Amino acid sequence: MAEKTEKPTAKKLRDAAKKGQTFKARDIVALVVIATGALSAPALVDLTRVAAEFTRIASTGAQPNPGAYALAWAKLFLRIAAPFVLLCAAVGALPSLVQSRFTLAVESIRFDLTALDPVKGMKRLFSWRSVKDAVKALLYVGVFAITVRVFADLYHHDVFGLFRARPALLGHMWIVLTVRLVLLFLLCALPVLIVDAAVEYFLYHRELKMDKHEVKQEYKESEGNHEIKSKRREIHQELLSEEIKANVEQSDFIVANPTHIAIGIYVNPDIVPIPFVSVRETNARALAVIRHAEACGVPVVRNVALARSIYRNSPRRYSFVNQDDIDGVMRVLIWLKEVEAANRGGPPREMPPEATHAPDAHGGDAASGGATSAQAGERNA
């Protein structure tokens, strides 16, 4: 069996998330819920109403109806506890959704009998995650002992002074001391939580590691084999009409952006010396134009700034290039003629200083333009 040494791919992580296998730092979720509950308890949990109710019953000595009495206490409990519980539930759900990247694990909902396999249960019992949980539990015991000691040193006067407090304030003081104890525990446990999250992240990626064969197979499935790629090229070709294909073939070059815009440039000095926009396509049709141009030997110059400028300043096909873009177009034409002359073996004439840097200044792709310009010269000849 091949050793799994490769990191999980994005597709592997997405497929695992659909099965419920996501990175889950449960202690961080618990930390957020407990901290939110501790901070919101003094404002949301009002025990003075409970104390006032007990005081009223004790002072009047009335004998209420048991059913009505229980119903009144239930309503009071819901009014006090419902906002607190809803807030904690909402705060607890948010970190879980963020960790799962808002992915619904639909495949984990189905009934799976393999989860009852005792062999898998034994493997989980003696796994690295079980060792991590055991060590974490021991660390939490130590953290709790330290928390109690520090809390006793800081607040023992407040604890022993509770017997002198008024009954109406007793509940509020207990809540305040409990909140302080909880926050102190969370502060002491924070290093353990961080280490636990880091180890959990490492174990999660370790479980999803892939061997090289799996990576190659996944790449083949996602990118497709040669037959599928050929079919995709055929689909791109079908996006173009015969008129567009003819315009591409007659163009002097195609300037691309590099995949979202394709502009065809045609120049005929015998008719008019101004460059002419013969093709103007975007998105999938632009990709089809680029593929067809490469297949026909028409130079393709990948120049983001020039392509965007021509597309913006020349809003229609079969229009002249705007005067703001003529300089850039002519620089590309001069450069292509120099490359064509060099590929034919003839001595290229010396370019003027402002044209020698045309490919770099406009982002021209020398490899693409140079490789296809020779074919273009043979076609034009």
UniProtKB/Swiss-Prot annotation:
Function, as annotated: Part of the bsa type III secretion system, is involved in the intracellular replication of invading bacteria inside the host cell. Probably necessary for the lysis of the vacuole membrane and escape into the host cell cytoplasm.
Annotated family: Belongs to the type III secretion exporter family.
Record's keyword annotation contains Acyltransferase: no
Gene (UniProt): bsaZ
PANTHER family, A to Z: FLAGELLAR BIOSYNTHETIC PROTEIN FLHB (PTHR30531), SURFACE PRESENTATION OF ANTIGENS PROTEIN SPAS (PTHR30531:SF14)
Domain of life: Bacteria
GO CC annotations on file: plasma membrane
Biological source species: Burkholderia thailandensis (strain ATCC 700388 / DSM 13276 / CCUG 48851 / CIP 106301 / E264)
GO biological process annotation, one example: protein secretion
Keywords: Cell membrane, Membrane, Transmembrane, Transmembrane helix, Virulence
Record protein name field: Secretion apparatus protein BsaZ
TM segment ranges: 28-48, 80-100, 134-154, 175-195
SUPFAM superfamilies documented for this protein: EscU C-terminal domain-like
Record field: compositional bias (Low complexity): 364-381
Membrane topology of the entry: Multi-pass membrane protein
Residue segments, region Disordered: 343-381
InterPro entries referenced in this protein's UniProt entry, alphabetically: BsaZ-like, T3SS_substrate_exporter, T3SS_substrate_exporter_C
Compartments reported by the entry: Cell membrane
